[in-house]
Amino acid sequence: TIVVEAPVVKSSVSFLDANTNPVTLEELTTQCVVPTWANQELTIAHQDFISCVHDAASSFYAGETVNAPDIRCSHIVRGRTPQSLGKKASELLECEKTQFYQRLAFAFTIPTIYETVNGQKLELCVGGVRNYSDLNLYRSTKGLEKFSVFIGWRVRICSNQVLTGEAVSYTHLR
């Protein structure tokens, strides 16, 4: 039997499944508002953060397959348009409702960049985390915006046991 290993075109990045909702970039763009500081200056939108990291990885790893990001969000904040401030929540029309997610995590793989260690395939994985509550949006002026970005190797395992192992360190990328 000949086994030919081919890169997986779309490998999902399962992470943070508990207490989060899967969303798409399109949903973030069309269904969520961008929060503002107290002086009404916009923050950087979650979808802009994701697109920036994805575009940077695509540019840096030009010629490689860069999968679409898997996005998880939590802590939805619901609001309303200024025109509907006097209405009860039950009387709001859909066009008068607003929402955004306070917390965001995303990750995507680059399956054409991989290493094999002890028979396990490790794919390169890039992602980020953001939390609007770290920003203190009630400040009177715009403050620093915080973002967390990570890059590392992802290994797929299937086990129903507690796992331990030795760390692997590489000083070069393929």
Region roles according to the model:
Residues H46, I50, Q99-R103, L144-F150:
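A general secondary-structure signal for short beta-strands and their flanking turns/coil
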Residues V168:
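TRNA-recognition modules of translation machinery and tRNA-sensing kinases, especially anticodon-binding
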Residues S58-Y114:
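Ser/Thr-rich, low-complexity intrinsically disordered terminal regions
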Residues T1-H54, S58-T65, P69-V77:
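Feature for intrinsically disordered/low-complexity regulatory segments and propeptides
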Residues K142-N160:
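Short, hydrophobic/proline-enriched secondary-structure or compact coil segments at domain edges
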Residues F106, T116-L144:
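Broad, structure-driven detector of short, well-ordered beta-strand segments within folded domains
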Residues T171-H172:
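Conserved small/polar residues in nucleotide/adenosyl-binding loops
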